[in-house]
Design a protein with these regions (language model features):
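N-terminal "arm"/small-domain region of PLP-dependent enzymes with the aminotransferase-like
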Residues: 2, 7-8, 12-68, 198
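Active-site phosphate-binding strand-loop segment of PLP-dependent enzymes
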Residues: 47, 147-202
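PLP-dependent enzyme catalytic core of the Aspartate aminotransferase-like
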Residues: 55, 59-63, 67, 94, ...
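Short loop-beta-helix segment that forms the pyridoxal 5′-phosphate
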Residues: 75-81, 89-113
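Conserved PLP-anchoring active-site segment centered on the Schiff-base-forming lysine
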Residues: 114-133
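Active-site PLP attachment segment
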Residues: 214, 220, 226-261
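Structural motif of enzymes handling amino- and sulfur-group chemistry
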Residues: 274-293, 299, 303
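Conserved PLP-binding catalytic core of the aspartate aminotransferase-like
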Residues: 299-305, 314-346, 356, 368-370
Length: 389
């Protein structure tokens, strides 16, 4: 019976120390969150520039509610596409150098929309083994032939491409890998696309806002500005709006005809109520702050360097220069115990366990922000050093 299966599945998950519970946050004060009556310094948030607490962005959202109401009321293609959606799409496209952008309610939805709307049976999809779950799910659902290459191994990827017989080839990768914090080789991936007439889809959820001189993400970080038609025609680029941008949603940028095709064929875009218009107003304000946010990014870089320098056991650290700083533990139960010890000391650092990461690679994922205080980073590092000693 299905009821027995549910009980057995839950019991099995609990026995492996993989059972998850929702943490209810009752209040937020900058980097501090209130959980179960205890104030904790939050080192789990993807709000890398602290913009979710920015007053200008908050005021833009409030003004958007006054102008357009609390909700869109319809899908984009019916009567839910407002001027603020249109304006922020044009703003991001101009900032990035793409011809057109499209607003989605979430990054997961955007990835499903792109892969499901553009890739089909008979195509070949090449995915990094550590890609986000949404990319993996979408690739399988596309019914294309899916190849998975070893993490960041472009030689392995090229061998796969050479062996593939499919006509249309797609390379799909995270920009910044969410569990390890390392960065894709954009120049290398683009070179393979040109060499083998392939297309490149990049999910830069954790790169946009923090990478590049003007915060424009992994392409700017790698000096791969997409002004040439040669590059632009091959790249589709997704950024989320709930991490560094500090609001909610996602946008996909590409050549105009590609985005136009998504509007025609992408079911996750067509068959859902449009994102709240006021959020688009907040995103627009945030994009301006990000473009001129060199000081925020410098502060974040200093915080990352301070944290890595302060951890005594360097073997715990991965090779990450980004705000995502995993501490490799291995055993899931041990990771939970350490996370609880940090919580008792006033810090919220989640234990990341399978199936989010491979078996025996459980970790603590420290997420740093430009708004973290030096004293809090040093205190956290000191507690980690004591617990891991």
């Amino acid at each position: 019976m299905f009821a027995d299966q549910i009980r057995n599945d839950l019991a099995k998950i609990k026995s492996k120390h993989l059972y998850r519970k929702l943490k209810v946050i009752d209040s937020v004060k900058k980097n501090n969150i209130l959980i179960d009556g205890q104030w904790l310094v939050n080192f789990a948030s993807n709000d890398y520039l602290g913009l979710s607490q920015n007053k200008k962005i908050q005021q833009a959202i409030i003004q958007g509610i006054r102008e357009f109401g609390a909700g869109a009321g319809a899908s984009h293609l019916i009567s839910g596409h407002f001027s603020c959606h249109d304006e922020v799409e044009k703003k991001l496209a101009k900032l990035l150098g793409f011809e057109k952008s499209l607003f989605f309610s979430s990054g997961y939805m955007a990835n499903m929309a792109v892969i499901g709307g553009l890739i089909k049976r008979g195509d070949a999809v090449f995915c990094d083994k550590l890609n986000h779950a949404s990319l993996n799910d979408a690739a399988v659902l596309s019914r294309a032939k899916v190849y998975r290459f070893n993490h960041l191994d472009l030689s392995f990827l090229e061998r796969q491409i050479k062996k593939s017989a499919e006509k249309n080839k797609w390379i799909i990768s995270d920009g910044v890998f969410s569990m390890d914090g390392d960065i894709a080789d954009i120049a290398g991936l683009l070179a393979l696309c040109h060499k083998y007439n392939a297309y490149l889809f990049i999910d830069d959820a954790h790169g946009y806002g923090v990478l590049g001189e003007n915060g424009q993400g992994i392409f700017e970080q790698n000096n791969q500005r997409l002004w040439s038609k040669k590059d632009l025609s091959r790249v589709i680029y997704m950024v989320t709006l709930g991490k560094s941008v500090g609001v909610s949603g996602a946008m996909v940028s590409a050549k105009k005809n590609i985005v136009d095709l998504l509007i025609q064929k992408s079911k996750p875009y067509i068959y859902t109520t449009a994102s709240i218009p006021a959020l688009a107003k907040g995103v627009s304000a945030s994009l301006d702050i990000i473009f001129h946010g060199q000081m925020l990014r410098k502060k974040l870089k200093r915080n990352i360097e301070l944290f890595r320098h302060s951890i005594k056991n360097k073997d715990l650290l991965l090779d990450s220069i980004t705000a995502i700083q995993p501490l490799m533990i291995g055993n899931a139960n041990k990771a939970l115990r350490i996370a609880e010890a940090l919580k008792e000391s006033g810090f919220y650092v989640p234990a990341i366990r399978p199936p989010t990461v491979p078996i025996n690679t459980s970790r603590l994922r420290v997420s740093l922000s430009s708004s973290h205080k030096r004293a809090d980073i040093l205190h956290l590092s000191n507690i980690i050093n004591q617990v891991m000693n």
